[in-house]
Amino acid sequence: MKNIKGPAIFLAQFMGDKPPFNSIEAICKWAASLGYIGVQIPTIDPRCIDLKKVAESKTYADEYKGTIESCGVKITELSTHIQGQLVAVHESDNFIFDNFAPKKLRGNYKARTAWATDQVKLAAKASKNLGLKAHATFSGALLWKTVYPWPQRPLGLVDAGFKELAKRWIPILNAFDKAGVDLCYEIHPSEDLHDGVTFERFLKATGNHPSVKILYDPSHQVLQQLDYLQFLDFYHPYIKMFHVKDAEFNPSGKSGVYGGYQDWIDRPGRFRSPGDGQVDFKSIFSKLAQYDYLGWAVLEWECCIKHPEQGAREGAQFIKDHMIRITDKAFDDFASAGTDAKLNRKILGI
């Protein structure tokens, strides 16, 4: 068994217009002051990273890495959630997702897809230059609108959808394979990879590509009413990233999983700060330790009630309290009889 690394924090939800949240150095120092030792960096925000420069210059990447570490934290992984989303967008969603892309590309959906693909490929090179082993992204979605089978899905639609999704991602996956970096898809509603079955469909469609991995976030599984602990039993060989994010699901006679188009505060399924929801993190950390998870425990804060600064402050200690120091001996070693071949034969009656 291995010791999990952490605590770390995903910076995306904390970037803002005022200090210390408006520059990468300031926010890293802030994170370190709270007890975090790692930061996960969103590559869509130019205040956080010059992705192209880090990808194309090992010298600059070393300088950038040194700057982050001088603030008291390490880079855990990079993220291309926004860019990954744009790798696969259903045409009916083009308008609503256009704000994710640079202004010059809005309305030019073919160019937007090419830009997104290039961005994620750059992240592979940047991750390699920074010495990182895993990367976070979204799969995008072509089939999500058919997740509820009404009207009835035509035969072959799902296979065709995953075939096209794999076609778009395989060149990117090849770039990650070449870089020696795992590409971890966050299993997430609104993405075509939103549960274990859809992950398996995608993996098969890519020909079991070795770079296809999982970012595990139990909060999304609570909101789907999926068994998030058994998910670890099924998919632990693929889980290379972990978001510590809590959630609660309190259905009523009025609303359930779909949420009734309500705001987050009123939805039966809501994201919460760690410890305020229903996720059994003690069991999660135990299972991750049992399965030799080698990555980081990264706080992702998305709570509809608590202030983010309070969530960040409490989150560092929450992760520390759940991290397990792996034992180096069996609890009953004191009663060990040692190794005795003759005794073993006697016990076996042979």
Regions found by a protein language model. Name each.
Residues 41-64, 84, 139-146:
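Glycine-rich, proline-tolerant flexible connector loops at the mouths of alpha/beta enzymes
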Residues 2, 27-35, 55-77, 93-94, ...:
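Acidic (Asp/Glu)-rich catalytic clusters
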Residues 3-7, 11-12, 22, 38-39, ...:
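Acidic/histidine-rich catalytic cores of soluble enzymes
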